[in-house]
C-alpha cells in the first residue's frame, strides 16, 4: 500500500534532526535523565548538586556563543547548590526540586539582575538590578531550586522566532545552518532544556510562547489554566491572556515545577 505524502515527509524529516551540540550520551550523566533520576543519583552519592550545577553552567557558557540561549548567568547558583548539598547531608531537603538546576525567562524579575526583557534598548534604559524575585522565581528558590540565570526571548516576549536585540538570534539545537527557528517567545528556556543544560525552566504563554518552542526543540511546554500561576513580578504582555508555566524535557519534570509555582498570588 503506497504511503501518503505526509508520511513520507515525516520519515525524511527524521534524517535531518541531528543536533549540532553533542547530546549527553552517558547514562551516568546527571543532566541526561529526569529529576527523579538526578535525585536518586544524589541519594547514592554518585554526584552532588554543586558538581552538577558547575557542569550545567560550564555547558551553558561554552555553548552560549552559538546558541544565544542565556541572557544573564547567576553568580549565586553555586552557593545555592552548596546549600542544597548541606541540606541533603542533614536529611532536610525541601522537596523534589531541591538542588535542581533551573532557568527563568528574561521577563521575570530576579533579585540582583536587571529585568531586560531581552531588549537591548530596555537594558540601557533600566540597567539597575531589581531588589526582589518574581513570585514564581521566589517559589522555585523556596523549593530549593538552583536558579542558573535568565534565558533569552523575543524582545518583550512579543514574537515567535527567538530573536533578541540583546542576545541575538537564539539557535535551534537541531539546526547546523541556523535556518530553522527555535520558536518563541520562550526560546532560550526551550533550547537550554533541550540541550541538557537545565532540567526545566520558566516561560510564559499567551498565543503559543511555551508550546511553539517546545514543539520546535523537542521538549514539553505548558500553558496552564489562566490564573493558576501568579504573575506578580513578570513583565506583562496581554493582561487577559498571560499564563506562566514550565518547559522541561519530561512531562513528570514539568509537573514538578508547575506544582512548585502554582497557587494564589499574594499580591
Where are these predicted regions, by residue range?
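An N-terminal boundary/leader segment
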Residues: 1-80
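Short glycine/serine-rich loop/turn segments
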Residues: 98-244
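Predominant activation on well-ordered alpha-helical scaffold segments within soluble catalytic domains
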Residues: 36-39, 54-57, 78, 82, ...
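Sec-exported extracytoplasmic/periplasmic mature domains
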Residues: 43, 57-65, 82, 86-89, ...
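A short helix-breaking turn/cap at a secondary-structure junction
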Residues: 26-28, 223-267
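Short, well-ordered beta-strand elements within core beta-sheets of diverse protein domains
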Residues: 37-44, 124-128, 242-249
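N-terminal, positively charged, Ser/Thr/Ala/Gly-biased leader segments
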Residues: 65-124
Amino acid at each position: 500500500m503506497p504511503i501518503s505524502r505526509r508520511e513520507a515527509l515525516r520519515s525524511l524529516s527524521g534524517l535531518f534532526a541531528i543536533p549540532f551540540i553533542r547530546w549527553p550520551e552517558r547514562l551516568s550523566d546527571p543532566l541526561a535523565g529526569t529529576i527523579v533520576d538526578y535525585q536518586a543519583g544524589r541519594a547514592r552519592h554518585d554526584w552532588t548538586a554543586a558538581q552538577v550545577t558547575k557542569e550545567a553552567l560550564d555547558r551553558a557558557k561554552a555553548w552560549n556563543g552559538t546558541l544565544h540561549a542565556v541572557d544573564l548567568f547567576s553568580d549565586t547558583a553555586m552557593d545555592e547548590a552548596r546549600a542544597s548539598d548541606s541540606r541533603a547531608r542533614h536529611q532536610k531537603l525541601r522537596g523534589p526540586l531541591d538542588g535542581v538546576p533551573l532557568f527563568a525567562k528574561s521577563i521575570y524579575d530576579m533579585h540582583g539582575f536587571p529585568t531586560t526583557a531581552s531588549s537591548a534598548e530596555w537594558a540601557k534604559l533600566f540597567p539597575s538590578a531589581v531588589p526582589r524575585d518574581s513570585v514564581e522565581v521566589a517559589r522555585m528558590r523556596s523549593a530549593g531550586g538552583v536558579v542558573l540565570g535568565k534565558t533569552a526571548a523575543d524582545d518583550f516576549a512579543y514574537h515567535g522566532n527567538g530573536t533578541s536585540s540583546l542576545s541575538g538570534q537564539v539557535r535551534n539545537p537541531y539546526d547546523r545552518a541556523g535556518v530553522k527557528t527555535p520558536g518563541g517567545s520562550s526560546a532560550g528556556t526551550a533550547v537550554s532544556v533541550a540541550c541538557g543544560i537545565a532540567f526545566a525552566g520558566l516561560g510564559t504563554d499567551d498565543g503559543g510562547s511555551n508550546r511553539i518552542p517546545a514543539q520546535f526543540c523537542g521538549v514539553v511546554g505548558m500553558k496552564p489554566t489562566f490564573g493558576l500561576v501568579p504573575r506578580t513580578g513578570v513583565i506583562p504582555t496581554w493582561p487577559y491572556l498571560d499564563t506562566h508555566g514550565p518547559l522541561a524535557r519530561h512531562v513528570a519534570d514539568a509537573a514538578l515545577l508547575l506544582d512548585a509555582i502554582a497557587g494564589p498570588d499574594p499580591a
